[in-house]
Amino acid sequence: MTNGGTDREAPTLDQARRQVGRYGLDVDPQAVLVAVRLISAGARVGRAAEAHFSRFGLSTGRYRLLADLEDCGGEKSPSRLAADLDVSRATVTGLVDGLERDGLVARRASVEDGRGAVVVLTARGAQRLREMAPEHFGRLEEMVGSLSVEERAVFLDLLARVVRGSSALTDE
């Protein structure tokens, strides 16, 4: 993608055709172009999300953890958080450490398993989510505001299919 949010995209379909032809591959250049642009768009949206969440003293990961805790009633084990957020336990530990320092979450012994710990959303963490909600959700709506309701439904379906196909990049 180019800077400044213009509609000009790189690479072009012609460039993808040349690249595929250069290597003598039997792959669809348009499929390659869609994948390359999706990866680029994902990186760009990721950078925008980090800038967005930094307004609230958070990162994307820290926000996702807080929102996940709020959605499940306020507490969850670190291993469950890792599974639900699709990140490693080490990542959860780092996120929780920072959120705990800021008073947004706390660790406590599990009632179900005295040996284990759970991460708990604090009142301060819940307040942070409430305070940021109007701006946060307003900006999310604005981000996809140029899409009609029907286009958003199609986009969600297409996105789910692409995400399922993303294992092609990680499979051995």
What are these regions (language model features)?
Residues 72-77:
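Short capping segments at the starts of secondary-structure elements
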